[in-house]
């Protein structure tokens, strides 16, 4: 039996307006090599000046994961030669990072929990981007110098499931703090996975393999499963020592395998030394006091939802997993609808209609509109069934709820006189069924309700229909 040992390095692009050491903008999708200056191009004589906002966001993150925030930290040079690094080194923090010794709790479906230790979170400058076009490689340096917070876990995870839970929790914390957009497709939340295996009960750490830059939670989970299978097969075949080497691998989603990219360097290979162009970084007491006051985090919001809205932990976790979802729900609650109905119509009905690029952030039906639709169910204006048709219409048309109801002709009839006339007609047309019902065949009651709803084209108030039929059928 083998045990899987996994540690993660997550590179979070911080959402500052300018780069880490210069005033170039960090915005995405600009023309190649236009967001650059002598500093981020590493031209001779250009000196770095630290962006203070990066420190502020680091304090917020350190507070969120209950970490030690070092009031004094230092920058170091990490030397390597890649085309996307014009300076031939990266400014990072090896010896004294800004954040150390944090922790993050992950929650399993069975209600159990596990704490994953965070070794450190350090500030570093991002590299540019290599663009491979057939036999030609191009370099875009717009991203060079963008501020990153690299969050390094301890090797505490034992399965792909734990990794996914950790990453989703970390992702939501970044979004709740609003220190980064954490967009995996745009590369602002990049994950390197370090995987090894060992015999169960063995405390030794065996050869670890790094899998780099996987851009979705699903692909990360699959890459881990494939790499663990590769290492386990090598161990069982007796080829572990020769086949499993310390290296960097890529996940090939088409061929469903991890494949070798390059040998993995040791720290000594990077020739770290203190950054000579930057002084020590000092966090003042005033900065600590101001930026350690952070917004409500996912776990806190979940606990509040359970208490305030009388829902179970699972429902609360669904609503708070993404800050956009939590904000949407709370906006619905401000309109005075029931929490139970808001939960159902948000998580089941609305989300069930999202396709392609549509999501909670750009939904054509905003929280106020969905809340009004729920209100129209609660006040008897329309039935729940009719409301689904209204929601379909609202997803395609930019109109208000009441206009949609009128256009579709779905307003519920609660006039007891009109409903009674329909009930009389249905009873008169189904005398044989009336006799059977009155002889004890109670299940036929649903037949009469269905016929009345059919005759009213779904517009009759179901409760009124039930009351009238019960009185008439006995």
UniProtKB/Swiss-Prot annotation:
Keyword Ligase: yes
Domain of life, per lineage: Bacteria
Phosphoprotein is among the record's keywords: no
EC category: ligase
Chain segments annotated as transmembrane: none
Enzyme Commission (EC) number: 6.3.5.-
Annotated catalysed reactions: L-glutamyl-tRNA(Gln) + L-glutamine + ATP + H2O = L-glutaminyl-tRNA(Gln) + L-glutamate + ADP + phosphate + H(+); L-aspartyl-tRNA(Asn) + L-glutamine + ATP + H2O = L-asparaginyl-tRNA(Asn) + L-glutamate + ADP + phosphate + 2 H(+)
Pfam family, one: GatB_N
A GO MF term: ATP binding
Function: Allows the formation of correctly charged Asn-tRNA(Asn) or Gln-tRNA(Gln) through the transamidation of misacylated Asp-tRNA(Asn) or Glu-tRNA(Gln) in organisms which lack either or both of asparaginyl-tRNA or glutaminyl-tRNA synthetases. The reaction takes place in the presence of glutamine and ATP through an activated phospho-Asp-tRNA(Asn) or phospho-Glu-tRNA(Gln).
Subunit structure: Heterotrimer of A, B and C subunits.
PANTHER family, per database record: GLUTAMYL-TRNA GLN AMIDOTRANSFERASE SUBUNIT B MITOCHONDRIAL AND PROKARYOTIC PET112-RELATED, GLUTAMYL-TRNA(GLN) AMIDOTRANSFERASE SUBUNIT B, MITOCHONDRIAL
Family label: Belongs to the GatB/GatE family. GatB subfamily.
Protein name as annotated: Aspartyl/glutamyl-tRNA(Asn/Gln) amidotransferase subunit B
